[in-house]
């Protein structure tokens, strides 16, 4: 606060909020600017939540319903609703009306969405914070519907896609903890099903749940729940790693850990979640957006089976864009794992080469290359190079059969508990396609800035972008021809490791602010059109116990036992 500037008196912001809400027409951005992350006053919570859920002024969806409570599972619905009423401090004369409201909301939702009710869905716990707002039945339904639609992910059940995604996020930030849970066969759905399905209301007290929802609904980001869940795990890490209990007991301890949250913990919970969020690639959201929202939008899910993904995948467009931005944010150190002849024919100009074939063919040279890689990463960050980044992103060819060795290298780094490890989605083929797509006027508009060649064939590579294919027929952007030229076997022997590191640092030391080229996010449909669904991330190499955690790059052990 500037010198001489007086702090607003206590309750001043609450008065401003009340006035803004009273005037009407208040949007979420206005509300957020007034609240600034503080806990909402009880008497204003209902209005703010309705704004955050975008249900202000919505009609009564139940108006045309006949009110018949006649589903086959109606007795189960009634029983669960009655148990909720019994747990709440509700005046006796209001219980019957409230019971009918809750049962009507669930019944109508099941009928209108053609969903079969089951107690394990956790809807009762999701309704509890809303019931405490004492909303009219129409608002209660609209709020419940909005939460289900916007904030509860599709397939939120055992072995569902949301939990495979959470495991990848955990592995990205806390590989040691993830590996430990993997070895115990404690999958995220075994302990976090009710965290995600009830937005923490299953285990947290009413006050704590309200405080969490106050912040979460204002975020207007459904993926933020993943980072709140991550912080719960990170907070319990030491306890988890020290546990010697059996699997079932450990799951119980972990599952109930949100119950330990208190009101004064919520501010730190959100601050830490924001930090981890800022250290996560944007592709985490962009590539999984179909998890949330209308079922019609999610019918065509990503081809990648997240249960088989070795690690988080990052789009090539994000890789190019991320290393141009200044200040804080995710920046990638790209590791090209293709054979030397493919790398020399053409590669991302900022990429470091680590020939994955060496892992089996020459382990000692591979070990030296890994040490050089980590040293190059460290120096590129310190020098302000555009190639510098904390986040390691491995790039293969994009062909599953060719990337098997790269997957082994990836598994090697993950086994060593290296954080911030990802894979370039679609590999070098996807990079070629993206650069061809955004440079519609040919290589002179910027293609050469990103593709480098150490074989003297840059001109032939560039000319193939908008030239004819080898068989004489043009494919528009010459991508097929480009792929052929880039992957031709030159049988060039790999350069000396030391010289490679020096050359890499010298050639990529341009400060970030000297690169004005702005890469746009590609149209999602465009990528899906050109990158085949067979270009998978690759088969996983999991189930390997962690050897040790990296504390110092100089001590990185790369000997393959």
Model-derived features: positions:
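Rhodanese-like catalytic fold shared by cysteine-dependent sulfurtransferases
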Residues: 284, 288-317, 332-333, 337-561
